[in-house]
Amino acid sequence: MKLALLLPWACCCLCGSALATGFLYPFSAAALQQHGYPEPGAGSPGSGYASRRHWCHHTVTRTVSCQVQNGSETVVQRVYQSCRWPGPCANLVSYRTLIRPTYRVSYRTVTVLEWRCCPGFTGSNCDEECMNCTRLSDMSERLTTLEAKVLLLEAAERPSSPDNDLPAPESTPPTWNEDFLPDAIPLAHPVPRQRRPTGPAGPPGQTGPPGPAGPPGSKGDRGQTGEKGPAGPPGLLGPPGPRGLPGEMGRPGPPGPPGPAGNPGPSPNSPQGALYSLQPPTDKDNGDSRLASAIVDTVLAGVPGPRGPPGPPGPPGPRGPPGPPGTPGSQGLAGERGTVGPSGEPGVKGEEGEKAATAEGEGVQQLREALKILAERVLILEHMIGIHDPLASPEGGSGQDAALRANLKMKRGGAQPDGVLAALLGPDPGQKSVDQASSRK
């Protein structure tokens, strides 16, 4: 605790000793006028010097932003070139590649000097001196002088002691703590009847703790203007402007000089004609590059020229008669198999046939049915393997058409049970008996 109290006191004493050495800071009038300080010539001769001697330069470190080059970028720029001569023409568009630097925002530390109050002074004009060791010692001396005068006044006002040894009448003075303030005089009894003799002055007491922090000072003056930052990168190239109006046509130039005399003409019997020549104008002032045609009546006479180039081909002639038929070509490949047509409507139910003879037993009938089914299966397998030609049309009533239909159904729907296959392929016994009866008739 004592160390914490002594450290601020030691700092204050060091600052006061530095200020008490009488350091003076002479500044130019231009620097003071820049920050709004009064001129040294205004007022009395000593007032100007006293108003600026408490200002000092303080080094302040600031962080400012700046742009730093960070590589480069390639940009393709479109360039429009307008017409360089009057009249209608197309604008020329070209492209060029530009390499320009790129920038990024960076921060740097800048050290600048600012005018502020010197250590130990405050206020708007730095004329208020802070509490320091010098002022504290002056106040201590003044307090010691005042205490000595008070003691002299107390000794002069003290009454003489009585001649006899009788004790003075005692009164009931209020309780007073003499150990806390031994030399203090109570206000209730300013003149006691009997007091102890005044002893010698004691040593000065210890310095008390520092007082509370004072209120914040006034706002400082405005600092100097910062340095001008670097120039920013160039902006993008703007779009080309609109096409200008065509200029006025120039004045016609003066007539050219007469040409040289021509050759003498041929005889009157020679053919006559007109010669057209293109001669550029002699006027170069207006920059007109158009060609002017001049018609000169001249008599042509000379040998016939070379043969001209052949003319363009004529239109195609009429279509000729058809030629004889050619030899028959080779037989083509077999076409793809067509899709299966839709199933036809069921036929009309036939007439009821004669009843079959019941002489045959049931075992023989079942054996026949089994043999028939076996034969049909063999035929189906032959068709699947390709022994029989699938394009050949089977004869009606031979049983091959039924086997072929069963083969197609099996290919589309897969294998079916034997009973279902027998029911789809083979006719019933009644139909068989009807067929036998019709064959007998």
Curated annotation (Swiss-Prot):
Cellular component terms (Gene Ontology): collagen type XXVI trimer; collagen-containing extracellular matrix; endoplasmic reticulum lumen; extracellular region; Golgi apparatus; plasma membrane
Signal peptide range in chain numbering: 1-20
Record bears the keyword Transmembrane: no
Keywords tagged on the record: Collagen, Disulfide bond, Extracellular matrix, Glycoprotein, Hydroxylation, Repeat, Secreted, Signal
Cystine pairs: 56-118, 83-89, 117-126
PTM summary: Hydroxylated on proline residues.
Keyword Nucleotide-binding tagged: no
Entry superkingdom: Eukaryota
Name of the protein described by the UniProt record: Collagen alpha-1(XXVI) chain
Source organism: Homo sapiens
